[in-house]
């Protein structure tokens, strides 16, 4: 059910569209790598609806935060967690009151090999693989969730020598896709449209909630395109795209 906040956002989008292309502007958006494909779709729909252009950059949430702290001119931040947007707000990098959850992420243990990954993750306790890929837990929330999952399953110490670490969840998926690792913990959004292979959607209770938050950054506080993009992200069209990629929406 669409919340009142999202209904209000939908109305704002209609008003922005009515303003026409004369008000068209551009905004720089830092996007957590797990959200690459939905962000591309949302940006295209946003341009059609408002005339504004959202220029997207993709990477790990931790890397983006470090760049922003050193003056990178991003105007909107779509993080893979809630901690960094909260920190941005506390440190004066983000506009107070603009932070909200845009998606709840899901973690998947994935392999290109059919039958390798079972429906309970028991493969992690077996000797049937040489490498498992995870994103850097210090920089990528999906990596932290992977670490928590292995610890909860009691397999982390045995699996640790087999771990290969990606700088972002995008690189982690590449490790699996190219065969550098037989299996890896990736975002559901990365494999939801991939046929074949084998996968286990990790129960949400096995790790901390992947609460993905967005925030308006100070370089964008007076940019109508930045504000419009966040309003659009809350609206029904973006919500439908987000759900299509396997995310949950509050």
Regions found by a protein language model. Name each.
Residues 9-20:
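Bacterial N-terminal signal peptides
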Residues 1-11:
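Bacterial N-terminal signal peptides that target proteins for export
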Residues 3-5, 19, 83:
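Short, intrinsically disordered low-complexity segments
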């Amino acid at each position: 059910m669409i919340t009142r906040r999202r209904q209000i956002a939908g109305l704002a989008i209609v008003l922005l569209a009515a303003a026409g292309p004369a008000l068209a502007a551009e905004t720089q958006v830092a996007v957590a790598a797990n959200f690459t494909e939905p962000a591309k779709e949302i940006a295209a729909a946003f341009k059609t609806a408002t005339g504004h252009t959202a220029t997207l950059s993709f990477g790990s949430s931790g890397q983006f935060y470090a760049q922003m702290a050193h003056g990178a001119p991003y105007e909107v931040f779509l993080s893979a967690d809630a901690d960094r947007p909260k920190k941005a707000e506390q440190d004066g990098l983000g506009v107070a009151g603009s932070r909200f959850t845009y998606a709840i992420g899901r973690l998947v243990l994935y392999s290109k090999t059919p039958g390798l990954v079972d429906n309970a993750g028991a493969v992690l306790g077996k000797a049937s693989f040489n490498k498992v890929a995870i994103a850097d837990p210090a920089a990528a929330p999906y990596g932290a969730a992977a670490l928590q999952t292995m610890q909860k399953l009691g397999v982390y110490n045995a699996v640790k020598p087999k771990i290969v670490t990606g700088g972002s969840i995008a690189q982690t998926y590449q490790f699996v896709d190219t065969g550098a690792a037989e299996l890896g913990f990736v975002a559901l959004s990365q494999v939801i449209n991939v046929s074949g292979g084998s996968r286990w959607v990790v129960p949400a209770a096995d790790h901390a909630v992947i609460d993905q938050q967005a925030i308006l950054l100070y370089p964008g506080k007076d940019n109508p395109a930045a504000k419009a993009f966040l309003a659009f992200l809350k609206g029904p069209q973006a919500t439908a795209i987000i759900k299509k990629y396997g995310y949950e929406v509050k």
